[in-house]
């Protein structure tokens, strides 16, 4: 390992231990009383479902994807694509659907996104997606409800 990489790993590791991992002004509110314990863990404790476990990975019908907690419309099916990551992925969100914050967990900097209506954590957004904006919204499938057209 190069010295610079080693120092970077040590620095981010110390930062993640010394600072709160998630600093947020995002207000979170459980609205759906029927959420499972696993959905609550992901949506309100910033968890992640296992890759490849969501049936939504294989959903190909036209429709829209909504927050499993508050039913806010988040994505249209035309923005869904197979990223090969094992999580439902989208290249464009409904305008105003999400609030973002920086996540320093696991010694790296990522952008986490939350439902703007209820604050539920949905996943991370990366700059390696297809299309003109280059975004890849990597979403936990348990956080979504698909509503066909």
Regions found by a protein language model. Give the residues of each.
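N-terminal secretory signal peptides and thylakoid transit peptides that target proteins
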Residues: 1-15
């Amino acid at each position: 390992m190069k010295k610079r990489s080693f120092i970077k790993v040590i620095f981010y590791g110390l930062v993640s231990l010394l600072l709160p991992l998630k600093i947020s002004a995002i207000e979170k509110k459980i609205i759906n009383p029927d959420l499972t314990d696993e959905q609550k863990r992901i949506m309100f404790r910033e968890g992640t479902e296992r890759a490849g476990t969501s049936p939504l990975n294989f959903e190909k019908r036209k429709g829209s994807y909504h927050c499993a907690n508050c039913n806010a419309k988040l994505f249209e099916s035309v923005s869904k694509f197979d990223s090969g990551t094992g999580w439902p992925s989208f290249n464009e969100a409904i305008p105003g659907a999400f609030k973002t914050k920086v996540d320093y967990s696991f010694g790296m900097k990522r952008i986490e996104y939350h439902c703007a209506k209820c604050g539920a954590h949905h996943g991370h957004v990366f700059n390696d997606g297809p299309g003109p904006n280059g975004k890849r919204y990597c979403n936990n499938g348990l956080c979504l409800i698909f509503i066909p057209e």
